Each structure stands twice: as C-alpha cells, then as structure tokens.
Amino acid sequence: MILGIGIDIIELNRIEKMINGKLNFIERILTETERDVAAKLKGKRLVEFVAGRFAAKEAYSKAVGTGIGKEVSFLDIEIKNDQKGKPVLFTNTEYIVHLSISHSREFAVAQVVLESPSC
C-alpha cells in the first residue's frame, strides 16, 4: 500500500550559490558517505549531485509528511547508487522507498513514493 508521495524541484543556480556562499552547506545536507562522493566531483557535476540529493531528501520528508525539521533531518537520509547507477534512499524506517532523481540545465527534481513493508 502506498503511504505517501513527495516531490521536490530545485534550481541548480540556487544550490551553486549555497555551495559557494555557505561554508557548511554541504556538511549540513550530505552524509559523510555522500560527501566522499561529492569530493570527487567538480563544477556543474558537483552542483547536480548536491541538488539531486537535496531534492531527494526534501521529497522524502514530504512523502513522510513532516518536512525537514525536528523529526527528519538531511543527515538522517542517505542516498547511494546501486550497481546500475540507480539512486537508492536509505533511512532508519521500515518503509519501502522508491526514488527517482533527474536534472535539466536549470533544475534538479526528485520524486519519492513510500510503500508499507507488508503489501
């Protein structure tokens, strides 16, 4: 059974400004494992990576129904890629999480569908 759906879209230039302007932006948004991946990226690819993770985490928090805040933080959510490159969202819940991330020249977008573990 579907428990929630969340979507988020973010402008790449907004994320780029936050990366360049706020010293701890990446540390507040990305887990240590995600930061290790980000450290290998530069320029537009880094911005796309951070924006995609930001949008995915926002979409997850919307699907849960809480938003980012007291109950769910950016660092409670980790996104890794499987062997085929598909993004997979990890968190400390029992939900089955379906995630899709996409980019264009100007935007990153992510959608999350939460499913109950006993379907």
Curated annotation (Swiss-Prot):
Biological process annotations from GO: fatty acid biosynthetic process; lysine biosynthetic process via aminoadipic acid
Any GO MF annotation of the entry: holo-[acyl-carrier-protein] synthase activity
Primary residence: cytoplasm
UniProt xrefs under InterPro entries: 4-PPantetheinyl_Trfase_dom, 4-PPantetheinyl_Trfase_dom_sf, ACPS, P-Pant_transferase_sf, Ppantetheine-prot_Trfase_dom
Binding positions (Mg(2+)): 8, 58
Compartments, record wording: Cytoplasm
A cellular-component GO term for this protein: cytosol
Catalytic reaction list: apo-[ACP] + CoA = holo-[ACP] + adenosine 3',5'-bisphosphate + H(+)
Keywords attached to this entry: Cytoplasm, Fatty acid biosynthesis, Fatty acid metabolism, Lipid biosynthesis, Lipid metabolism, Magnesium, Metal-binding, Transferase
Cofactor(s) needed by this chain: Mg(2+)
PANTHER family with a match to the protein in the record: L-AMINOADIPATE-SEMIALDEHYDE DEHYDROGENASE-PHOSPHOPANTETHEINYL TRANSFERASE (PTHR12215:SF10), PHOSPHOPANTETHEINE TRANSFERASE (PTHR12215)
Annotated family: Belongs to the P-Pant transferase superfamily. AcpS family.
Function summary: Transfers the 4'-phosphopantetheine moiety from coenzyme A to a Ser of acyl-carrier-protein.
Name of this protein: Holo-[acyl-carrier-protein] synthase
Gene behind the chain: acpS
